[in-house]
Amino acid sequence: MAYSTREILLALCIRDSRVHGNGTLHPVLELAARETPLRLSPEDTVVLRYHVLLEEIIERNSETFTETWNRFITHTEHVDLDFNSVFLEIFHRGDPSLGRALAWMAWCMHACRTLCCNQSTPYYVVDLSVRGMLEASEGLDGWIHQQGGWSTLIEDNIPGSRRFSWTLFLAGLTLSLLVICSYLFISRGRH
């Protein structure tokens, strides 16, 4: 079955919230799940495999993720629209790659985790952020469909395999592009 990027990312954020949260799902994620009924469960094999892959990317690049997110959230004025702006900076040539897609998904999952686990984050900031990342991510759907869908892409990346290692490596390199794009976006927005 072909899943949209929105469905995959939302299921990943819900899964991640259950793993790293305080046992309850953030109300914004509950609302998003009601607005976009999921055709796959956060416990689905596809979601679990992507979660492992994205966790590895986040763990290997934790300082970069934290620094980039802090810079983004500190300098953004319209968080929902700004997710789309960063997405457009990363994929502006219309030439996505698996590394870019995974770096983007990992950054979004990390952002969602950071926002949902921080009790002092205002509801509206979490709401606008989750909406912004889900909407921006829909821009990957055409490319993902051409690659055979999210399910096909993860089947080729089994943890421990050579391809899995290369995927992690390429996603790490692509993360630097994410950092550069977010800095460019932020500095452009300040002038």
Swiss-Prot record:
PROSITE patterns reported for this sequence: BCL2_FAMILY, BH2
UniProt-listed GO biological process terms: negative regulation of release of cytochrome c from mitochondria; symbiont-mediated suppression of host apoptosis; symbiont-mediated suppression of host autophagy
Cited Gene3D superfamilies: Blc2-like
Subcellular location: Host membrane; Host mitochondrion
Major location (coarse): host cell
Stretches that traverse the bilayer: 166-186
Pfam families according to UniProt: Bcl-2 (PF00452)
Gene Ontology cellular component terms for the protein in this record: host cell membrane; host cell mitochondrion; membrane
Family annotation (InterPro entries): Bcl-2-like_sf, Bcl-2_BH1-3, Bcl2-like, Bcl2_BH2_motif_CS
Membrane topology: Single-pass membrane protein
Superkingdom of source: Viruses
Keyword field: Apoptosis, Early protein, Glycoprotein, Host membrane, Host mitochondrion, Host-virus interaction, Inhibition of host apoptosis by viral BCL2-like protein, Inhibition of host autophagy by virus, Membrane, Modulation of host cell apoptosis by virus, Transmembrane, Transmembrane helix
Glycosylation sites: N22, N118
Region of interest (Interaction with host VRK2), residue spans: 1-18, 89-142
Motif (BH1): 89-109
Motif range (BH2): 142-157
Family: Belongs to the Bcl-2 family.
Subunit text: Interacts with isoform 1 of host VRK2; this interaction is involved in protecting cells from apoptosis. Interacts with host PRA1; this interaction seems to modulate BHRF1 anti-apoptotic activity. Interacts with host BCL2L11. Interacts with host BAD and BBC3. Interacts with BALF1; BALF1 acting as a negative regulator of the survival function of BHRF1. Interacts with host BECN1.
Protein role: Prevents premature death of the host cell during virus production, which would otherwise reduce the amount of progeny virus. Acts as a host B-cell leukemia/lymphoma 2 (Bcl-2) homolog, and interacts with pro-apoptotic proteins to prevent mitochondria permeabilization, release of cytochrome c and subsequent apoptosis of the host cell. In addition, plays a role in the inhibiton of host BECN1-mediated starvation-induced autophagy without affecting basal levels of autophagy.
Other observations noted: EA-R is part of the restricted EA-complex.
Name listed for the protein in its UniProt record: Apoptosis regulator BHRF1
Species whose genome carries this gene: Epstein-Barr virus (strain B95-8) (HHV-4)
